[in-house]
Amino acid sequence: RGLLAIAIPITFGSAALQLMTMLETKIYMGQLLNLGYTQSAADTMRGVYGMCLTIFNMPCAFITPITISIIPAITSHLTLCGDDEAKATEESAVRITGLVAMPCAFGLALLAEPITALLGGYSGGNLAMATRLMTVLGFTIIFNALVLVSTAIMQAHGHAGRPVINMLIGGVVNLVAVYVLAGMPLINILGTPTGLLMGYVVISILNILSMRRLLPKPPAEALERDRLTRA
């Protein structure tokens, strides 16, 4: 029963996330067509954005193992050592995640043009579009990392359902933002990564508030002093 209590919310959250990704694509493609872009132009924009998303997901390959490894570590500390040891592990995880996420975020944001030119082979207008998209996605990595580590911390404490609810709320914010921003002629496809950024910001805030409310000793030092953004 305990295993199901953890597995069901996580499985439901993963399925809902995939559904929202499909809805996001449908929304921004529809908005681009409504703006007067041809199907070919809209498909090109989707392809460029998809390539930028692939680059955006690369830092997760380094951050995800951290979040996976801290769950049993925190659980064992809670069982054998108490809340203080668990809190120390959580704060270390936040700092280490920041050490990985911050260079990736600013590196991709500041070097968006040469990175997309090298990995995507773009030039001209497509390169300019990829640069703008990658810049926004670069800064999104910061909040994505915070979401990953805070979700793992709450799961280790047995609160697997709350991160899923927060993720669904952030997903709705993302979809609404994409619908509004992608429908603006001056923003168009740039509204898609901007909506993603807004969604992750909302999830990050909700996760932090949830940890302060649900955890006996949340990693307050790391979060209140914004260790993640200064690591």
Question: Model-predicted segments: where are they?
Answer:
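Interhelical loop/hinge segments that connect adjacent transmembrane helices in multipass membrane
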Residues: 1-12, 81-84, 213-230
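Interfacial transmembrane-helix starts/ends
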Residues: 3-4, 50, 82-99, 103-111, ...
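Alpha-helical transmembrane segments of polytopic membrane transporters and translocases
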Residues: 9, 42-63, 95-99
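Helix-loop junctions and terminal segments of transmembrane helices
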Residues: 60-82
